[in-house]
């Protein structure tokens, strides 16, 4: 069958070709297959385009026609519209044409007012947009700064040992985010604040934290707090601020004494433990004391004679080794005992050492010191006895560039040696190699050596000790805070120093965690204490708001850049984030009284804090929460103002169980009942708007329930819209006094009222003229009244200076027409 079809097609083609050849006046056109295909595609595309356009027009007509629009007339109506008559230049008028002149002046005034309003609107929109962008950018900056826990390259340290910040972590709801160490510290903070708030004698926060550390069964942490306790046991120097106090010579000398005492006591304990661990080798005996302890320790430390030791022995032990280790244990009297026994071998050293022992700050007089330094340079510097050299360098505070690594082979020994050589007097005659100041030593440890030298990932507590013992408290805390496992210890050390007024705080809240400030002496750094505390509490604020509140209490006297209390600010953010309004701020009872919350413990002026939290909630758009908080703070103006904003969008909605409208309605009714029973009232305009909105809710409830007569009675009593031509002017004048919350519902109110009139009209028409014995005349009168009321609504809608939503006017007119 296919063969027959092709054969027939071939026959027709040949016939067509023969007919074409017979017409001699037509030229022959020869095309190959590709040209024929292209021509066919062009014809097909033209046909498809025309068909698709017609199809689109048909679809548009169907769509718009279903909405009652005639597409054939739309283009004609659009072409007939012209904006030229509105904004075209006014025609010139003759000088004697008063009517034309007045018309032009009126039009000019209207156009000027419109243009001015347009410009002002655009300027205000730009300003609001710019302010919003600045606020948002500031929040982003704060979040970025809060994630940078340290300055410089340390903030971008992504080594394997660095642990992930907890800032992004969130604990499981209902569970505490605090681990056992953090909880132990939190209990001590609670106990401390209890004493402070109750007005009792302020306890020592260092003591409380030390007790918590002892229960943790971690020697590193226990030693840390022993060191903190030792270093903070200094008399506070009276000064106008912490910086002057910390930089005073008396305070620095006090820190130095405490650091030396800590290192000496630690070494003595180490010596004692070494001896008791090797009793057989140590051969401990004799009168208990440092001298015999050192002798036993030397049996372990120097089991065999060391070549090069000078000036003989005392009871078989090297003289200078005995002196050094007695000094290292902090017992100068034991060292004096050794010197006295070997005085014939030591020459004038006995007198120098005796003066050193009995001096106030372990400092020789300038004459004796110069004499000792001269002897050191001439005879001792080249000595083969390392113990002799180090003792001379300590007593004479000379040759500070020599680290004496043969003797001081541990970090603690090096620290003790250098701190023993630090001087505070301004010595003009001293050479640089004989002078070491505390700022120089601090710089050497923190900047020259730094973290890499001390292998901080393996021994973080050692580096903290190095910085803390050299009075670099802020740098030590910032370092420890960067490590996840030691962060809580750093925070509580900072709290302890803060309470003792020994902490140097940053002046700006946006500063880095550790910062330098212009004009500060060398070696001084500031800690952003507020940021440190806020970063720490962020982890457990959602799950443990009570504990976070305890920490925020330390900020009660701190101010932000706007002079606002940081305690207020942090509490407000805590309440908003945790949503624990009742637990933190208290709860409003049915009788209007307030049940105290956690905040009541810390301040009597709870109203200020609650108002602040409410203000923050309002600024964040949390109007419902803000209204409840203002109610808690006894601020009826703000309560009703925000309730009006909440009610306005839902007034005309159909009520449903557990809906947003139902919840807000119940809240508003409870407020209204309580305020009426207690005689509470707000500002007159806010008050009237609130109760009018409640009446409108009643109106729409009846309307949606189909109770048109009850709804009509409500709207008639409200006198919000005119129901007669005589009251139109009065209602239009009264409309100007209504708030925006009422105006926004005007379209729905008018439509609902017109629907009620139309429903009554249809019911009247459907009842018949003689139903229930109603006379014809009465029915006509009722008809006339309903039409008059509908006409009054139309007139009112056209006269009010308010642009109603959508096609309100068209729908009103449509229903009014159906009633005629």
UniProtKB/Swiss-Prot annotation:
Highest taxon listed in the record's lineage: Eukaryota
Membrane topology (UniProt): Peripheral membrane protein
Keyword set, alphabetical order: Membrane, mRNA transport, Nuclear pore complex, Nucleus, Phosphoprotein, Protein transport, Translocation, Transport
Subcellular location: Nucleus membrane; Nucleus, Nuclear pore complex
GO MF, any single term: structural constituent of nuclear pore
Pfam families on file: Nic96
GO cellular component terms attached to this protein's record: nuclear membrane; nuclear periphery; nuclear pore
GO biological process: mRNA transport; nuclear pore complex assembly; protein transport
Annotated family: Belongs to the nucleoporin interacting component (NIC) family.
Known function: Plays a role in the nuclear pore complex (NPC) assembly and/or maintenance.
Protein name listed in UniProt: Nuclear pore complex protein Nup93
Gene name of the record: nup93
């Amino acid at each position: 069958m296919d063969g027959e079809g092709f054969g027939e097609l071939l026959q027709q083609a040949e016939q067509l070709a023969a007919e074409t050849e017979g017409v001699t006046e037509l030229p022959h056109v020869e095309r190959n297959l590709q040209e024929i295909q292209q021509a066919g595609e062009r014809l097909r595309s033209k046909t498809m385009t025309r068909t698709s356009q017609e199809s689109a027009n048909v679809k548009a007509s169907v769509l718009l026609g279903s909405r009652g629009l005639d597409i054939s007339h739309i283009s004609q109506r659009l072409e007939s519209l012209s904006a030229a008559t509105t904004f075209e230049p006014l025609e010139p008028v003759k000088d004697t044409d008063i009517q034309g002149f007045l018309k032009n002046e009126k039009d000019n005034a209207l156009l000027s007012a419109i243009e001015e309003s347009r410009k002002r609107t655009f300027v205000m929109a730009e300003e609001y947009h710019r302010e919003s962008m600045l606020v948002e950018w500031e929040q982003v900056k704060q979040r970025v700064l809060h994630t940078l826990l340290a300055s410089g390259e340390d903030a971008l340290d992504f080594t394997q040992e660095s642990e992930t910040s907890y800032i992004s972590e969130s604990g499981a709801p209902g569970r505490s985010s605090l681990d056992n160490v953090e909880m132990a510290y939190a209990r001590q903070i609670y106990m401390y604040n209890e004493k402070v708030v109750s007005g009792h004698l302020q306890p020592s926060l260092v003591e409380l934290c030390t007790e918590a550390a002892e229960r943790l069964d971690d020697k590193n942490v226990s030693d840390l707090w022993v060191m903190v306790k030792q270093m903070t046991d200094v008399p506070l120097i009276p000064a106008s601020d912490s910086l002057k106090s910390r930089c005073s010579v008396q305070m620095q000398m006090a820190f130095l004494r405490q650091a030396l005492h800590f290192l000496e006591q630690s070494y003595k304990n180490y010596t004692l433990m070494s001896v008791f661990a090797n009793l057989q080798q140590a051969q401990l005996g004799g009168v208990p004391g440092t001298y015999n302890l050192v002798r036993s320790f030397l049996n372990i430390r120097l089991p065999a004679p060391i070549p090069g030791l000078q000036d003989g022995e005392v009871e078989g032990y090297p003289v200078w080794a005995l002196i050094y280790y007695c000094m290292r244990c902090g017992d100068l009297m034991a060292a004096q005992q050794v010197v006295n026994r070997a005085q014939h071998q030591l020459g004038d050293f006995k007198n120098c050492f005796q003066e050193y022992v009995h001096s106030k700050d372990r400092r020789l007089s300038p004459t004796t010191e110069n004499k000792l330094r001269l002897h050191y340079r001439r005879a001792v510097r080249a000595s083969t006895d390392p113990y002799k050299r180090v003792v001379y360098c300590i007593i004479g505070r000379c040759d500070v560039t020599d680290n004496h690594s043969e003797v001081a082979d541990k970090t603690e020994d090096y620290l003790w040696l250098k701190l023993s050589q630090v001087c505070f007097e301004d010595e003009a005659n001293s050479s640089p190699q004989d002078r070491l100041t505390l700022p120089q030593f601090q710089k050497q440890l923190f900047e020259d050596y730094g973290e890499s030298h001390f292998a901080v990932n393996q021994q973080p507590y050692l580096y903290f000790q190095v910085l803390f013992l050299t009075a670099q408290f802020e740098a030590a805390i910032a370092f420890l805070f960067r490590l996840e496992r030691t962060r809580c210890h750093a925070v509580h050390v900072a709290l302890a120093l803060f309470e003792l007024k020994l902490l140097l705080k940053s002046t700006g809240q946006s500063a880095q965690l550790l910062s330098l400030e212009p004009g500060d002496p060398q070696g001084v750094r500031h800690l952003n204490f507020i940021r440190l505390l806020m970063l720490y509490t962020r982890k457990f604020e959602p799950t443990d708001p009570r504990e976070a509140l305890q920490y925020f209490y330390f900020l009660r006297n701190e101010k932000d850049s706007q002079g606002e209390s940081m305690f207020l600010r942090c509490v407000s953010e805590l309440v908003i984030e945790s949503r624990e309004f009742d637990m933190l701020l208290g709860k409003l009872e049915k009788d209007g009284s307030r049940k105290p919350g956690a905040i009541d413990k810390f301040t009597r002026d709870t109203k200020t804090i609650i108002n602040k939290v409410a203000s923050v909630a309002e600024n964040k758009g949390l109007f419902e929460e803000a209204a409840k908080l203002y109610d808690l703070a006894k601020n009826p103006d703000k309560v009703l103002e925000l309730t009006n904003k909440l009610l306005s969008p839902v007034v005309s909605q159909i009520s449903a169980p557990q809906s947003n409208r139902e919840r807000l309605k119940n809240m508003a009714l409870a407020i209204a009942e309580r305020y009426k029973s207690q005689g509470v009232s707000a500002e007159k305009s806010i008050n009237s708007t609130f109760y009018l909105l409640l009446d409108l809710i009643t109106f729409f409830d009846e309307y949606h329930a189909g109770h048109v007569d009850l709804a009509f009675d409500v709207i008639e009593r409200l006198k919000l819209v005119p129901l007669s031509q005589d009251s139109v002017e009065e209602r239009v004048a009264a409309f100007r006094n209504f708030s925006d919350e009422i105006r926004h519902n005007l379209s729905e109110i008018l439509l609902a009222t017109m629907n009620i009139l139309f429903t009554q009209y249809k019911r009247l028409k459907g009842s018949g003229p003689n139903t229930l014995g109603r006379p014809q005349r009465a029915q006509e009168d009722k008809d006339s009244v309903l039409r008059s009321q509908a006409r009054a609504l139309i007139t009112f809608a056209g006269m009010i200076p308010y642009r109603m939503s959508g096609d309100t006017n068209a729908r009103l007119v449509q229903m009014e027409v159906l009633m005629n």
